């Protein structure tokens, strides 16, 4: 996020000379003798030189000053610098390619904010070691309190999903299913670890009852398609429609079939207990279809896991249709496009993505965009141009987090994938039309008597009006930081907290830069507030958000504890 804020020239009248006012007018209305867009572009550059950099954010400045969205698009400049610091969080899946401490350190340096553990693969022992490695890698940055990088750990449940078994050669083996060949899909336990090119075991006993002759079975995000030709006591006799390489433990989709799996399996319950015991921060709940599925997960976490955030993954048609009730009881949403693109027509996935991100933005809840974002980087060092556009458009849609799956879990270039997503997000964030976005979010905000929420709206508007370089918020649970993030300030939200978990979970919220303050409380509460604010300022200077002369908005409470945030101050950095 940049350390500078955009402001409209007509708001500077009391601070600039008449010649500069005339110049500012030419920016907004054009000038005689040439195209308004060209003159606006040239005039903005001249005005910036005359006024210095204190009043304007430099990234995509001409587009940021636009009066309409179409004009904003026309004025985007490929030579403009990206934002100084990325505000969209990066979630990276940890697997064989990224399991080691050294590789995790590299990924943290590259920009990983949340580490995802996929419990569809691996044993509890394997994931316990992954958690230990992640924490060791994070602690290696703890020598400097100002440079410490809290990384959240997320447990992704298996959920009511169907998967294939293990192939004969072991978990790393792949076999090719050739188009036109015959494959037996069986539930016979004897084939659980003996799959091959002609026999595929699946872990759903009722598959022979719910898939009719003529029905289709999709494997591995739909890359492999089988059509059922015959059903007998051995299983489903199928013919390969679309072939490909089949690995172990791949996801299976049965489009159109009424799958009767429970929302929370016994395996999921065991995995959730494991997560509570190992203090994970987030649960990504797979295949959530209705609000009661979320309630079951919350109950399974128990009182010890009450502070764990539940992010519901929307992966089928039922989940999309019941989205509002799921959103209401969830802490956030993941747009899981892999399975979703099989359960609903692929050409409608973008509609579901935009709808879900928009509703999450209105509700002020985090939303993650996931699956196949940089898929080609599993085997190649550079993404396709379509993939870079996909990541950028997820950011422009309003996603709080963007996720890497196989790219970092099993890919050849896990660190490079994180770096690429980081670079794309920085460019995309510079192109967000913040002027329109904040106005729409503010208008859509319901009337509230909650002092914290009212203060958050005021702080974000003040940051726009005075061109604040950052908003520093002191928070105990992270709620104040999330409320500030809801209104998408262009300034960095520096969240100072003594809660390690709140610092880690803050990465779910766009534009929030969490700081863990580990000093003991001062005897006088006002002194303690000042010390934490100063800690935030020093960190902002270190990260490049703040410079001498910049204004910052400070949001604090009127007394110790959570739920009392209602004070806003404007400070100048000295």
UniProtKB/Swiss-Prot annotation:
Question: Could you say which residues bind ATP here?
Answer: 118-121, 163, 250
- Which cofactors? Mg(2+); Mn(2+); K(+)
Q: Which Gene Ontology terms cover its molecular function?
A: ATP binding; kinase activity; magnesium ion binding; potassium ion binding; pyruvate kinase activity
Q: Which residues bind beta-D-fructose 1,6-bisphosphate?
A: 475-480, 525, 532, 559-564
Q: Which residues carry this modification: Phosphoserine?
A: 2, 19, 26, 43, 292
Kindly name one Pfam family recorded for this protein.
Answer: PK_C
Task: State where substrate binds.
Answer: 116, 313, 338-339, 371
Q: In which pathway does it act?
A: Carbohydrate degradation; glycolysis; pyruvate from D-glyceraldehyde 3-phosphate: step 5/5
Instruction: Summarize the activity regulation.
Output: Allosterically activated by fructose 1,6-bisphosphate.
Q: Which reaction is catalysed here?
A: pyruvate + ATP = phosphoenolpyruvate + ADP + H(+)
**Annotated positions for site Transition state stabilizer:** 313
List GO BP terms, alphabetically. Answer: cellular response to insulin stimulus; glycolytic process
Residues bound to Mn(2+) are: 315, 339
Zinc in keyword set: no
Residues that hold K(+) according to the record: 118, 120, 156-157
GO terms under cellular component: cytoplasm
Locate the coiled-coil region(s) and give their ranges.
Answer: none
Query: NCBIfam families this protein is in?
Result: PRK05826.1, PRK06354.1, pyruv_kin
Implicated disorder: Defects in PKLR are a cause of inherited hemolytic anemia, an autosomal recessive disease of the Basenji dog that closely resembles human pyruvate kinase deficiency.
Q: What else is known?
A: There are 4 isozymes of pyruvate kinase in mammals: L, R, M1 and M2. L type is major isozyme in the liver, R is found in red cells, M1 is the main form in muscle, heart and brain, and M2 is found in early fetal tissues.
Q: What does this protein do?
A: Pyruvate kinase that catalyzes the conversion of phosphoenolpyruvate to pyruvate with the synthesis of ATP, and which plays a key role in glycolysis.
PANTHER family in alphabetical order: PYRUVATE KINASE
Fill in the subunit field for this protein: Homotetramer.
Q: What is this protein called?
A: Pyruvate kinase PKLR
Q: Which organism is it from?
A: Canis lupus familiaris (Dog)
Gene encoding this chain? PKLR
């Amino acid at each position: 996020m940049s350390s500078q804020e955009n402001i409209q020239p007509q708001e500077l009248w009391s601070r600039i000379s008449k010649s500069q006012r005339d110049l500012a007018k030419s920016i907004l209305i054009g000038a005689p003798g040439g195209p308004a867009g060209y003159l606006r572009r040239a005039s903005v550059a001249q005005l910036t030189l005359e006024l210095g950099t204190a009043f304007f954010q430099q990234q995509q400045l001409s587009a940021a000053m636009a009066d309409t969205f179409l004009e904003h698009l026309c004025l985007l400049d490929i030579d403009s610098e990206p934002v100084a610091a990325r505000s969209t969080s990066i979630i990276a899946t940890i697997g064989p390619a990224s399991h080691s401490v050294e590789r995790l350190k590299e990924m943290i340096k590259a920009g990983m904010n949340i580490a995802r553990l996929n419990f569809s693969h691996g044993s509890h022992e394997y994931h316990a070691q992954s958690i230990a490695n992640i924490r060791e890698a994070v602690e290696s940055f703890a020598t400097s309190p100002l440079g410490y990088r809290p990384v959240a750990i997320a447990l992704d449940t298996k959920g009511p999903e169907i998967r294939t078994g293990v192939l004969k050669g072991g978990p790393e083996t792949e076999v090719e299913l050739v188009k036109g060949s015959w494959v037996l899909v069986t539930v016979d336990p004897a084939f659980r670890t003996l799959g091959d090119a002609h026999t595929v075991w699946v872990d759903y006993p009722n598959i022979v009852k719910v898939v009719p002759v003529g029905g289709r079975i999709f494997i591995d995000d739909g890359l492999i398609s089988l059509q059922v030709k015959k059903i007998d006591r051995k299983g489903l006799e199928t013919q390969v429609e679309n072939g490909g390489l089949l690995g172990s433990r791949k996801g299976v989709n049965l489009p159109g079939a009424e799958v009767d799996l429970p929302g929370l399996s016994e395996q999921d319950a065991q995995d959730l207990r494991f997560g509570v015991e190992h203090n994970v921060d987030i649960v990504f709940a797979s295949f959530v279809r209705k609000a009661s599925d979320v309630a079951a997960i919350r109950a399974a976490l128990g009182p010890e896991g009450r502070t764990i955030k539940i992010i519901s993954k929307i992966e089928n048609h039922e989940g999309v249709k019941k989205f509002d009730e799921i959103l209401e009881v969830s802490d956030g949403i993941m747009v899981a496009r892999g399975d979703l693109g099989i359960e609903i027509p692929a050409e409608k996935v973008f509609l579901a993505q935009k709808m879900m991100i928009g509703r999450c933005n209105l509700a002020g809840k985090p939303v993650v965009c996931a699956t196949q974002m940089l898929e080609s980087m599993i085997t190649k060092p550079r993404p396709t141009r379509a993939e870079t556009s996909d990541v950028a458009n997820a950011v422009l849609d309003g996603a709080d987090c963007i996720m890497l799956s196989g790219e970092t879990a099993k890919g050849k270039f896990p660190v490079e994938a994180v770096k690429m997503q980081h670079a794309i997000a920085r460019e995309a964030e510079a192109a967000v039309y913040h002027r329109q976005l904040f106005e729409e979010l503010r208008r859509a905000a319901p009337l509230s008597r909650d002092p914290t929420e009212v203060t958050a709206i005021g702080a974000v508007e003040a940051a726009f009006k005075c061109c604040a370089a950052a908003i520093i918020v002191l928070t105990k649970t992270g709620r104040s930081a999330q409320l500030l993030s809801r209104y998408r300030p262009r300034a960095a939200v520096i969240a100072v907290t003594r809660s390690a978990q709140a610092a880690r979970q803050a990465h779910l919220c766009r534009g929030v830069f969490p700081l863990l303050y580990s000093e003991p409380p001062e005897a006088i509460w006002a002194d303690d507030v000042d010390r934490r604010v100063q800690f935030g300022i020093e960190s902002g200077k270190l990260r490049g958000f703040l410079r001498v002369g910049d204004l910052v908005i400070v949001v604090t409470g009127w007394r110790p504890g959570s739920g009392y945030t209602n004070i806003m101050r404007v400070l100048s950095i000295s």
